[in-house]
Structure formats: structure tokens, C-alpha cells
């Protein structure tokens, strides 16, 4: 099931023939009113808008005609398993998809002194970081090299950086020019007496007033139950109205309404322009790989590993290790040699024995301006995870924009390193054949070892062999089970994990959705 707040408002489901008729009327009117290209396929319509006016017109007419709308093309190849895309009784009805990736791809107003930029939602993350690299800046989100992820989609996910200190895209969002479901345009940004953002319509004024009221009504629940300092992929970021030290969002603790739209997966509004705060690209990075007997054993070290402030701390499973061991890229081969993975270990990586946990590993990166400091951090990590290791105790060097350098070998131009794919798959996972990946809601990293051990015991007792992978700094793990075991694993998770939200918070999420999209036409991403 999709997160409940991603679903449209409850309404009588129209028949397919009625929906098709309304879509035909919408397309007929749009052909006269928009400059973008309209494509009809499979009973649906796809609009590639030339500009923001096309989007505003399309949304206004779609609301009038009750045609469901999806925002496509903004998430690249990010799969629905993480994207939280809406799915409902309306999901199969004829609808309109608005795709930003063809024409809304401009970046503007780059401030190289302060590290700020304005972009349209169809700009691809890889293109932006390529543009910024000569200036020493980057947007610190790392996706799969071939994902084609765009900024509109990543903001919709509130994608997390690999380093806890680098935050999520909500933390990088200074403002958002949004288009609401009725075509109203509004800049969402800092709110308060010192803000220069004005509410330019009665709809916007009423909306903002209602949002503050909703947040005030659940302040007590948030103080007791809101997850501290974590991404919220299954709710809206109501904590922007009650900032806390664990995640202040803004330097002075003020309210920035753009942050509420981060992570909403296109269910609240269209992001027309994003105003982003960039990060200085670190001068040097070093990596290391450490084998562990099991995921639960690896995660017992999580608090100590994270206390060293790595710029990436990934938990790998046996399938990930097999990919590294089978790679022809010298980066991956060097990492495997460092961890003692050789040809003789192939049997250990083939999978766990029945009733036993599978092999796991830490893949850890430290980054900084001074290589001596980065090497020192790796030595402390090596002393923690593998005190007997001598060679490579200072990690393998990764230069900005280059590959691992310490082994002195070049890779063929068409061979991509597996470690880079593994890093990006924390945002956009590759699902192995005959496997099911179930993302867990973000957890406190200090509790992960006990949680994984308990779930391993329950799943193994039911004949399911689990493995675990994920981004430990963000407390986000992915449970991997055989494809047919997915329903049983989900049931076990539901019986083990405590409820995420109180009834009052669930109602608040629904109220936020209703304020933005009262007719329920916005179905989110593709």
C-alpha cells in the first residue's frame, strides 16, 4: 500500500468512459491554449510544457474538468518503491501527465560567492553538478549515475545526502515558486515580519493561515512523537512550523513554507522554480570497506561509526558484495583487496546458509579539506572495525570528479564503478531479479541493531532469509527478501515496528492535503 497521505481525497470514482470523455475535452481545450506538445498514448495524455504558463493553464482546466494529474519526467528512473507515488482508485483512469524534463531545464541566477542558484524542475542533478564543479560547489545528493534524476523529482522525495551533516533537499531549499491545483502561482519561502515574500492572492492567504492552524493543533503530538532529525517519506514536514535543534531547517529557526512542499511527491503543488543553497565540494575523500559477519553485527557499531562523522556510511548485503567482487573496475577491485575479498571468498558471498544471517559490510567515506584529517578519521574507523588491518588503514583516496587513485590503475572508459552505483542506489535502488526491496521508515541509528536482530529472528523462523542494505547515517534501511516473501515480510514489519503517527498527526496530514488539493486531482509523481 502507498502511504495513505499520497492518495487523493475520497470521492465517488467516475467511470472510465466518463473520465475518458473529460480527458478528451481537456485535450481539446489545451491544444488551443498551450504552446507545449500534447501526446496521446494508452488512454492518457502527456503534456510537455514550454513554460510555466502552460502548467498553470493545464492545472486550472484539469481541476475544472476533474481530470487526475500526475507529474512525470521529474524523477528520472527513480522507482515507485521509494518515490511514494500516489496510487488509488483513480490511478487507472484516463488522466494528464505533465512532464518537465523536455523543456523546463534552465538554471539561472547562480551566485558563486554565496553558493545559491535558481533552477527549473526538469534540470537533471548530474547536469547541475557538472555545471557547478568548476566553481567548487555542488548539490550533495548522489544518485545512481544512470538514473537521470531531476531536481523537481528529488525535491519531491526530499532526497537525503549520504552525510547526516549535509541534510536533505529540504535543508537546501531556500524557496519554491509553486503552481497550485487551480493555477494560482505563489512563492513559498521565509515567512514572518522580516520576510520579503508576499502572499499574492486570496487563495494563498487562506491556505497559509489554514496551514499554521493545522500545525498549531498538533504541536503537542509533534513534541512527543515526531521523529527527531530524520527524513519523513510517509508524511508532510509539519515540523517546519515547530523547528527543533535536531533539524532547524533555517539558521535562525524561522518558518520557511517551501520546506513543507519538500517530500510531498507532487501531491500538493507543482514546483515551477527551485531556489537552492549549495554546498562547497570537499577537496578530498577516502573510502574503505569492512566485512562484517551479519547486518545486526555491523549495526552494533553504528553509533560509534557515526560519531566519527563520515560523509557516507552504507550497509551492504551479500548481493552488493558479489557485485563489487565481480567488477572489472579497478576502484572496486582495490576496495575488495582492502577488505580481504579475493577469489577464494566467492563461496562466502553466495548467500547465507538456512537459519543463519548473511554476510554484510560497511562502505564508509570521509571527506574534508585536508587529506591528513581524512586519513586520521579512517585510522580511527579502522581501529574500531578491523584493528588488525595495516595496509590501507588510511582509506583509498577519491579526488573530486575522479576515481580511486591509490591503486594507480585506470579503468576502461565504459566501465562504471560499482561503489558509485551502490552509493546512488540509496536513493534509487536496483531491485535484484526475484527479489523484493522493502524500505523501512527512517529509524534512530542507535536502535537499528536491535531492530534488525529481532526482525531477522522472526523472518528466519518463518522460512524467509532476509538481507539488509541502506544509508545508516539517515537511519534508512532496505529489507531484501525473495520476491514471493514480500507480503509475509511486510506483515512481520507491521507487527514489529511501532505506529509512526498518532491519529491526530494522520488527520493533520490529510488536512494539509485537502487544503492544497480539495478536489483530489493531484496524484503525485508518475
What role is predicted for each listed range?
Residues 38-111, 118-121, 139-141, 462, ...:
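Glycine-rich N-terminal segment of FAD-binding domains in flavoprotein oxidoreductases
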Residues 67-72, 136-144, 185, 387-391:
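Short secondary-structure capping/junction motifs at helix and strand boundaries
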Residues 10-12, 16-19, 23, 497, ...:
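Intrinsic disorder at enzyme termini
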